Every structure is written in structure tokens, then in C-alpha cells.
UniProtKB/Swiss-Prot annotation:
Protein's cellular compartments: Nucleus, Nucleolus
Name of the protein: Probable ribonuclease P/MRP protein subunit POP5
Organism for this UniProt entry: Arabidopsis thaliana
Gene behind the chain: EMB1687
Pfam families: RNase_P_Rpp14
Gene3D superfamilies associated with the record: Ribonuclease P, Pop5 subunit (3.30.70.3250)
Changes seen on gene knockout: Defective embryo arrested at the globular stage.
Disulfide bonds: none
Keywords: Nucleus, tRNA processing
Gene Ontology biological process terms from the UniProt entry: tRNA 5'-leader removal
Amino acid sequence: MVGFKNRYMLMEVFLDPDKDLLGEGTPIILTQFNLSKAIKDSILVNFGECGLGSSLGSFQVKYVNPITKLCIVRSSREEHRQVWLAITLVKSIGNCPVILNLLDISGCIRACRDTALKCDKEKFEQCSKSLSEEEIRQMNTSLEKIKLLEN
């Protein structure tokens, strides 16, 4: 039996620093659903229905941390460049302008998970003093979720 060959992309979401938030805090809560929708919309706009159909076979947003804004996206090996390009061309999630930065690309979930865990811990150490108790609880939940991440 032959397994599917996938690529896992670790990326970071930057909210647009030029947009004035007027004290609203974070304008959007990053979820698997809204990130997946933004990437699928980008694939549809840039590659058409055929490109979207070929990419959807194994496309999945595997992990999203709403505090550190790190995400893991899975795609097939054959279509990962197309998904990568579509990720690069995403300009907004909802009505919030964003920039998506690819940090790592890997052939197995374990290597990507380890890199994401390292990045999450470093970011958490940097911002832990300014987080509320609820955000710290949410961060710890995300760290536990990524440790359990497998196929």
C-alpha cells in the first residue's frame, strides 16, 4: 500500500501594521475555517476552478494558534507549489489585511510540528508577560494540541 505524499507548510500570519485598529485589539480571531477559506478563495481567483479542484484533494489547515498566529497547512506534493503561491497572494482574511510568511516546508508532519512547537514556545516566552490569564490558558491548550498533532 502506498501512502499519499504530502507537504506541510508552517506559516506565520501578520496582521497589517499599517491599519489603525483604534484600540479595538485584534480585529480578527484566526481560526482554521477563516484561514482555509482565504487560501481556497486565493486558489480559485488565481488558478480557477480546475486549480481549486486539483488542490482540494489533500488540502487541510491542520493547526492554528490564535495567540502566536502560527499555522500548519497540508497539501499534496504535486500541488504544494500552487498552494504555496496562493498563500503568498492572500491579502486579507475577512476584512482584515494580512501578510502570510512561510517559515518552513516539510515532507512529514513530525518535522513541521517540532518546528512549530519551537516557534510557539519562543513567541510565548516573548509575550507571556502581556497576556491575560484566558490567553495563557488558550496558549497552553494550543501547545497541547500541537504536541498531539499527527496525521
